[in-house]
Amino acid sequence: MQSSLRIFSGILALSLSGSLYALPECPSGPSEKWHNCFGTFSIDGDKYFGEYKEGKQHGQGTYTRADGEKYVGEFKEDKMHGQGTYTRADGEKYVGEWKEDKMHGQGTYTRADGGKYVGEFNENKMHGQGTYTFADGKKYFGELKEGKNHGQGTYTFADGRKYVGEWKEGLYHGQGTYSFADGRVFRGHYMNNQYVPSICQDMGLTKGTEAFGQCVLKLIDEITKDN
């Protein structure tokens, strides 16, 4: 029985190592000459273990930085490229697609405080369609541009409040509906996070007057041109 277990363990170890790297081990000598093999390279406390092609990190590999940060995944010509996982020293983690050392494509970024973004990235920034769930319970689902809520989106607060509508550079801007937990609803146009009728009232104009109506129409026109 013990003999059978030893044989099984040996087969398992061989199959695992074979599944990790199908290429042969790189020969001794400068890494610039390594080709179609896997090897280990260290410099200034950083360490790479993985596949090489024409002297460059290319294929599957693991790169561990001296500060403890680590990338495990695909490489292309010495750059993180393809599917991979990057774990920061503070615990933050990105799992998803990479392009030339940048988060690019579909991915999931988890912050150290528990906040999480799942969606599209463009050159290291949240960009496209995505969902961001905050550690305190708030949630945004919709379009983003260069890391900010931009376009159509829904923002839900932990206390039940909700905004559904247009955004611009992280602010309510355009057509939208703001619902309160007590049932009140402000539906209409927003400008830089403010409800348009409220802006006119703050200017001292009385709701229902001609001046108030002109103020509202003017701001809506500005918003329309701005978008």
Which positions does each model-derived feature cover?
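Bacterial N-terminal signal peptides that target proteins for export
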Residues: 1-9
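Glycine/tyrosine- and acidic-biased, solvent-exposed loop/turn segments at the edges of beta-strands
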Residues: 20-227
